[in-house]
Design a protein with these regions (language model features):
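Conserved N-terminal beta1-alpha1 strand-loop-helix module at the mouth
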Residues: 1-207
Length: 207
């Protein structure tokens, strides 16, 4: 079995892009949500260095045309859709290019969550399960054990308050295909603590 995917979100500085990639991140997230303290302009994201890790844009309220335009300008590989976009929107971006966020706490049962995710079969590359009922980057965690029985038709990433002290437990219990790290590996919003990043990614990759 291959090692879980590791995404580090909220890139704002060149040294964090390079440091996270060197630590073993597979995906790096660039946020284009105006309400986020980690928000970048497309030009700012475009100016950050290219590394081996794939570049992911995080979008909440943008139109399809805006998403596609920013992806082109900032040279992004994937779009993480965090605004409840429907399957048609995802297909228009490109199923192989989309990570779509879901919020388990919006659902009364695991079956309800699974049904929503099933509607996106063939429309997205990865699902991402985040804490809360909207948005992300708030540092809250999901109930790992409650997700252990989830078997959606696509690979999924776990997000929400993950860092060096709980990411190994999250992987062991919830069994996602990967994890998304943000506030749990920061010294302040948008500024990564590379020691926390390295400790977290060692746990993810089993180094």
């Amino acid at each position: 079995m291959s090692a879980p995917l590791a995404k580090v979100c909220g890139m704002t500085r060149a040294e964090d892009v390079v440091g996270c990639a060197e630590a073993g991140a597979d995906l790096l997230g660039f946020i284009f949500a105006a309400k986020s303290p980690r928000c970048l302009t497309p030009a700012q994201a475009a100016a950050l260095p290219r590394v081996a890790a794939k570049r992911v844009g995080v979008f909440v309220e943008q139109t399809l045309e805006e998403v596609l335009g920013i992806m082109a300008e900032a040279e992004l590989d994937l779009a993480q859709l965090h605004g409840g976009q429907d399957p048609d929107f995802c297909r228009a971006v490109g199923p192989h290019r989309v990570i779509r966020a879901f919020w388990p706490q919006k659902h009364p049962t695991l079956g309800s969550l699974a049904a929503e995710m099933a509607a996106f079969d063939g429309a997205i590359r990865y699902a991402l399960l985040d804490a809360g009922t909207s948005g992300g980057g708030h540092g809250k965690s999901l109930d790992f054990a409650a997700l252990a029985e989830l078997a959606p038709p696509m690979p999924w990433l776990l997000a929400g308050g993950l860092g060096p002290d709980n990411v190994a437990e999250a992987l062991r219990i919830a069994k996602p295909h990967g994890v998304d790290l943000n506030s749990g590996v920061e010294s302040s919003p948008g500024l990564k603590d590379l020691q926390k990043v390295r400790r977290s990614l060692w746990a993810v990759k089993g180094v």
